[in-house]
Every structure is written in structure tokens, then in C-alpha cells.
């Protein structure tokens, strides 16, 4: 039974998240329906990351097994045709055959995310639901300086959801950079894996630094507190993008 690796882009606005759930449409469910419509097979599509409702992806990776040995290009085009016909905001950017032991989630060695903030007085029109609108000036240099305090291997209890199902709060953060181009502030994060709401918690806390409500020392103290109550407000999902997975 051949295994295929997919690179997937989606607008997460109208989905309950990547993972199939009973309370609304999911990205996983949309792809599985497209596969069923195309092949008649009921399959499980497994993703590298279970993004939440409203979170977008430019490079989610998934895998699935089919009984037929499809040509990757043909499978990609056919799935996109079925997704488009169903009105889904999901696009298959690439399909390739994968080794039988490849697992989109467990074979990953690093995941890369982007969080976008637009810092300006005027409300968002074209970027609505694509970024976090912050109608005030933010000091991105201070945000970047503070972000460097979080790099390395730490107990990130402060920055994970109370509902996080991970068995350990320990993670190694490889990258957390803050840059600015015009009104756009970008926070880029890389690690082998992240805790639930970890990046949105980073973004919300870094915003406090950008507003001069927190200093970099305050952010480090929040990390060292190992207490969810020490976290700043969790940033909305609109600005978060799953960008890429390394294997």
C-alpha cells in the first residue's frame, strides 16, 4: 500500500482546526472527504501539527496510504479539484511518494511557525483574519531582545494552555526572532515540537514588552515562574501560520 506525503496550505478561519472534530468542519476532514470522493477509500490523513481553529498553514505536512499507486502530480491535481469543488479553503501544494515508515508527525525534527502582527491605527481590511491588529506602536527591538531570553531547553509551563495534553512541559526552543517591515511585525519560532498555545502565548507576552508594559526581565521572570497565571494574554489565532516542517 503506497504512502504519500502532502504539503498543505489552508486558511484556518472557518475550520475548527486541523483535527477532525464533531463540532464543525476540520482541515483533516476536508482532505479525507476529497480522498473518499476521488478514490472511494476511507483513509486517515495524519498531519505534522494539530493547528487550532483560526490558525493558518503555508506548509503543513501530512501523509496518507492508498491502495492504488497514483502518480503524485495526478493525485495532487485530482485532490485539489475535489477540494475546490467542495468550496474548501485548502490547497495541496505538493505530493510525493514516501517511505513506508515515514510519519508526518513523528518523523519531524523541526517545526517552523510565523506569527504576524500589524501595528497601525487603521483597522485591517485586506489582512483581517490574517494577522493580529494592534492599533498602537510596538517596540520590536525590545520584543526581540526579550524573545532571546526564551531560547534553549526550559520548562514552558507558563506558556502552555491549561488544557495542554503533553506529558511534559519541557521543550527546546531553537529560534524566536522578532522583525519589522513597515507596519508588519513578524515573530518566527522554530523547535522540534511546541506545547498547546505556546507560540500564541509567546506573542501575547511579547506584545506587552513591545508596549513597554513588560521588560525583558519581566518575560524571563514569567518563564521562571512556571505558572500559567504569569503569562501575558494569549494572542488570537488569526496571526499564526504553520510554515514548514523539517525531516
UniProtKB/Swiss-Prot annotation:
Chain residues that bind substrate: 113
EC number from the UniProt entry: 5.4.99.12
Top class in the EC scheme: isomerase
GO molecular function, one term: tRNA pseudouridine(38-40) synthase activity
Keyword vocabulary terms for this entry: Isomerase, tRNA processing
Any GO BP annotation: tRNA pseudouridine synthesis
Active site: 52 (nucleophile)
Catalysed reactions, as listed in the record: uridine(38/39/40) in tRNA = pseudouridine(38/39/40) in tRNA
Function of the protein: Formation of pseudouridine at positions 38, 39 and 40 in the anticodon stem and loop of transfer RNAs.
Family membership noted in the UniProt record: Belongs to the tRNA pseudouridine synthase TruA family.
PANTHER family named in the record: PSEUDOURIDYLATE SYNTHASE, TRNA PSEUDOURIDINE SYNTHASE-LIKE 1
Subunit-level organization: Homodimer.
Protein name: tRNA pseudouridine synthase A
Organism: Sinorhizobium medicae (strain WSM419)
Lineage: Bacteria, Pseudomonadati, Pseudomonadota, Alphaproteobacteria, Hyphomicrobiales
